[in-house]
């Protein structure tokens, strides 16, 4: 006779539980506050992902991996309907055009073309666009990626932290000329209070529950750009004979 206990399967009606302690009480107790990014409170910035600049990135095993992370992040924003702002710097010269996939994914979005100011947050036109988006949506969690982590990502991150934003740099959707640049930038941003994230983990944090209606739309970034979990999804889909499984947990009566 088997002594194996029966698995406990949570009800499919379960919803996400918030922390038991309020943010104010956690702060007063000296604890960290988990003020996480969500599709409802976030804005996503793509800074200077231009083909000329991307060609100089040296801290990835391949530029294909780097490009895949950037486009995976973009597809995540698209799937979850997170507002985005895209900026470029001197695109008419050596920096080159914005990555084609970004332009295709966000075909309805303008590109804010800076003409010399390196820190996008210090550019009056771009900051005006961001502040307008913040005021009209009441979103103050800024998810940020930049072509170079030491400049395009770090500089606006430090500026926005000073102005009271919650900033989440997506460090594997940023490149660097060297490992030293990446290490210095990561240390600098973390020390200033930024919450560093990665493309895959951020996508999971934003989705939060695979029972949410956005789950189907979130398949695209995982299948196309985040194979670490995309392979798992494909395996399930194939084993299910490529049709939806009505009762994957076997709990419906």
Stretches found by the model and what they are:
Residues 115-118, 172-175, 202:
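Short, acidic/turn-prone active-site loops that include or flank metal/cofactor-
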Residues 199, 206-207:
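Short linear, low-complexity motifs centered on an aromatic residue
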Residues 116-124, 147-151:
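A general structural motif
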Residues 106, 130, 160, 164:
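Active-site catalytic pocket residues across diverse enzymes, especially alpha/beta-hydrolases
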Residues 2-117, 132-137, 183-190, 207-208, ...:
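Active-site acidic carboxylates
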Residues 111-114, 195-201:
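Short acidic-hydrophobic, aromatic-tinged amphipathic segments that line or gate anion-handling sites
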Residues 125-129:
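Short glycine-cluster motifs
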Residues 140-199:
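A contiguous pocket-lining binding segment that forms or flanks enzyme active sites
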């Amino acid at each position: 006779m088997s002594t194996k206990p029966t698995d406990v399967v949570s009800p499919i009606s379960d919803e996400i539980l918030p922390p038991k302690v309020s943010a104010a009480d956690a702060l007063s107790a000296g604890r960290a506050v988990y003020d996480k990014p969500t599709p409802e409170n976030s804005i996503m910035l793509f800074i200077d992902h231009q083909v000329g600049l991307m060609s100089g990135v040296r801290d990835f095993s391949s530029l294909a991996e780097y490009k895949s992370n950037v486009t995976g992040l973009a597809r995540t924003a698209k799937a979850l309907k997170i507002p985005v702002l895209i900026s470029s710097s001197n695109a008419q010269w050596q920096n080159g055009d914005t990555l084609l996939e970004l332009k295709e994914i966000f075909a309805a979005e303008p590109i804010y073309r800076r003409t010399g100011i390196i820190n996008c947050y210090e550019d009056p036109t771009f900051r005006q666009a961001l502040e307008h988006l913040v005021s009209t949506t009441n979103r103050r969690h800024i998810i940020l990626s930049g072509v170079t982590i030491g400049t395009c990502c770090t500089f606006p991150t430090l500026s926005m932290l000073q102005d009271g934003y919650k900033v989440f740099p997506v460090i594997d959707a940023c490149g660097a000329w060297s490992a030293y640049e990446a290490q210095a930038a990561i240390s600098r941003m973390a020390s200033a209070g930024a919450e560093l994230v990665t493309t895959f983990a951020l996508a999971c944090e934003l989705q939060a529950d695979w029972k949410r209606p956005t789950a189907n739309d979130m398949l695209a970034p995982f299948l196309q750009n985040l194979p670490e979990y995309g392979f798992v999804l494909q395996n399930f889909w194939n084993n299910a004979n490529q049709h939806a499984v009505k009762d994957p947990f076997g709990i419906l009566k």
